[in-house]
Amino acid sequence: DLAAALDDRAPPAARLNTRVRPVPVKTQVGQVAFTVPLRTLTGLRWLTWIAAANNAGSALFDLTWLPTVSWWWVALGWLLLISPPGRMVLTAAGARMLLRPVTPGDYPRGGKIHLRLWLAERLADEMGAANLAGATWMRYYARALGADVGKNVDLHSIPPVTGLLTLGDRCSVEQEVDLRGHWLDGDVLHVGTVEIGLEARIGARSMLAPGARVGARAEIAPGSAVFGDVPEGEAWSGAPARRAGQARGPWELDRPAHRPVWLVAYAAVAGLIAMLPGLAVLAGLAGMAPPFDPPRRLADGGAGGDGRPPPP
C-alpha cells in the first residue's frame, strides 16, 4: 500500500521537447544592425533635453561657452520625441508600416515576420510610447496601432503592436494584462487575435493567449491565463483559466459620470512626468552656474565684514 501511494504521488512523465532549430545567422545579424538606429532614437531624445538645457544655461546664466541651437528645433524634438502623443504617433506609424503583411497564423522563429515583429516591439520600447507618461492616451494609441476599440473602454494595459485586438463597448482591462497576442513555442511563432466582448472585465496581470475570445459581460479573475473562448456572462479563473461560476456583474447599474476635465488633468500630469528628465538636467546645469554673491549686511551700512567700506 505504501509503495502504491508513493507511485501515485510521483510526478507525471514530461513530454520530451522536439528539436528546436536555432535562429538563422542572418536574422541575428539583422537584429544587431537594427539595434544601432533603435538606440539612436533614445540618444536623440536625450540630445533634445541637452539642447534645451544648453539654450537655457546660455540665456539665464551667461554660459556663453555652451553650444546652442534654435528653439524651433528644440520644440520640434520635444513634440516628436518627448511628448506622449508624439512618441505614440511615431511608434504607431512605424509599427503599422513594419507589420503591414502580418496576419494571424504560425511563422518560423527567426523568419521575416518574426524579425518585423521584434523590430516593432523594440521601436515601441525605445520610444517609450507606453510608459507611465502615456497612460492617459492608451485608448488612442491602441486605435493608432489598428485595434478596434469600442465606446467608453477602460484600457489600463499596453495594446499589441500588431493591432490584432478588439475591445467591445464599455469593457474594462486592468493593469499589466498581457494582450500581445503572440508567443514563441520552440521554433514556431504563434500570432493571433484577442477579442474582449461588451462589458467584459479582465483582471490585473492576466494573460490572453493568441486566439483568446472573452464573451460579453464575462469576468476574468486577476492572474488568469485564458486560452480559447470564454462564454458570455461566465466567470473564469486560474492558469489555465477554467469556469468558476457566473459573472457577478457591475457593483452599480449606473456608470460613473464621464468628466473630460479629469482626462485633461491626467494628460497634463503625463506631460509633466515626461519632463522630469529635463528638470534633472537643469538641476545639474544649475550646479555649474557662477556662485551667488549675497548683498552686504544692512547693519554695516553696505560695508564689508570688517566695517570698512568696500573697495571701489
Q: Across the structure, where does each feature detected by a protein language model lie?
A:
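AMP-binding/adenylate-forming catalytic domain of the ANL superfamily
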Residues: 1-3
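Terminal amphipathic alpha-helical/low-complexity segments used for targeting or macromolecular assembly
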Residues: 7, 12-146, 232-312
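Structural signal for interior beta-strand "rungs" in well-ordered beta-sheet cores
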Residues: 142-144, 148-243
